[in-house]
A protein has these predicted regions:
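Secondary-structure junction motif
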Residues: 179, 192-213, 278-287, 296
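N-terminal winged-helix
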Residues: 30-31, 88-119, 123-128, 132-136, ...
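Flexible hinge/capping segments at coil-to-helix
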Residues: 157-168, 172-194
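Beta-alpha-beta core module
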Residues: 155-161, 165-167, 227-275
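A late-sequence structural motif
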Residues: 107, 256-296
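Short beta-strand-centered segments that line the small-molecule binding cleft or hinge
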Residues: 110-114, 131-172, 208, 234-237, ...
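A short LG(V/I)-centered, amphipathic sequence patch enriched
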Residues: 41-60, 77
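Short helix-boundary/capping micro-motifs
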Residues: 10-27
Length: 296
């Protein structure tokens, strides 16, 4: 399978038309494009397109291949950029960092500031996501580093622990009965409609940290990142498990954070692939991070 074929496929998927892709994007004849896509379908052994007079759409297999094709082209772009800039004496290039929502991202920001002071032509690309999103992109080579909230399996990675802990609790409306308490217990959660992140719902370790199987509670919704979940809470749709300090709960905010008792906290780690071949910008970031943490 050639990269050209993947580019052709993505153009057809984007334009939803063989003729538009051929004439407006790829500048090849339509028969040439059709032949290339037919050969791709034969190579993969699946039908990728549903062709009609109005437009061309993707089959279920086509949608799955589109996701992989986009990942391949993104990785190719990273690689081309990395090697084009590697020969320059001054460190120029990109660092790709992913992480969950946590106040500890300030360590990443401080390391980037330190790195930028020395290497101002390094660009940083930040991706927000839960541990599954981040480790998947890390494994695919689309990220250089990931900031993960524990408990998390980090056996596949090199890592440094951050000197910080995040506190777990509930995000509730200020007029919610639990808002009047200084702390909440697991017993307080009985019959309370709850929102939990998809990551925590899938992790036995989190149930162990909480001291209760989340599936035994009244979880009415799951979320990926906390902001949209906070809108549900603001509308009175329950209380959300979350970490302290991710949202502004002061002033005119309708929301407040109530920590658990006994206190439940999570450590934080920055991870990267074992035995990596770092680009110069990625190596510069790791050096800056370790300096920020007093490790170098």
């Amino acid at each position: 399978m050639e990269l050209r074929t993947i580019r052709y496929f993505l153009a057809v998927a984007e334009q939803e038309s063989f003729s538009a892709a051929a004439n407006n994007v790829l500048f090849v004849t339509q028969p040439t494009l059709s032949r290339q896509m037919q050969e791709l379908e034969e190579e993969l052994g699946v039908q990728l397109f549903v062709r009609s007079n109005k437009k061309t759409t993707l089959t279920e297999e086509g949608l799955r291949f589109k996701k992989r094709a986009q990942e391949i082209m993104e990785l190719v772009g990273h690689t081309e950029k990395e090697f084009a800039e590697a020969s320059k004496e001054e460190i120029v290039g990109d660092v790709y960092i992913g992480g969950g929502e946590t106040k500890a991202f300030s360590f990443i920001a401080a390391a980037c500031k330190r790195m930028q002071a020395k290497h101002p032509k390094i660009r940083m690309h930040i991706t927000s996501g839960n541990a599954q999103d981040v480790t998947e992109k890390l494994d695919q080579g689309l990220l250089d580093f990931g900031l993960l909230v524990e408990p998390v399996d980090k056996s596949k990675y090199e890592f440094v622990e951050l000197p910080a802990k995040d506190t777990w609790g509930l995000l509730v409306r200020k007029d919610h009965p639990l808002a009047k308490k200084g702390f909440v217990t697991i017993r307080d959660l009985e019959n309370v409609p709850l929102l939990a992140s998809r990551q925590t719902m899938m992790m036995r370790e989190f149930s162990g940290l909480l001291g209760r199987d989340l599936h035994s509670l009244n979880v009415i919704a799951t979320y990926n990142l906390i902001y949209n979940a906070s809108v549900f809470v603001e509308q009175g749709l329950g209380a959300a498990f979350c970490l302290e300090g991710l949202l502004n709960t002061g002033g005119k905010s309708k929301l407040t954070f109530v920590p658990f008792t006994p206190l439940r906290t999570s450590g934080l780690v920055v991870v990267w692939k074992k035995s990596p071949v770092f680009s110069k910008p990625a190596a510069a970031f790791l050096h800056s991070l370790k300096q920020e943490l007093g490790m170098e």
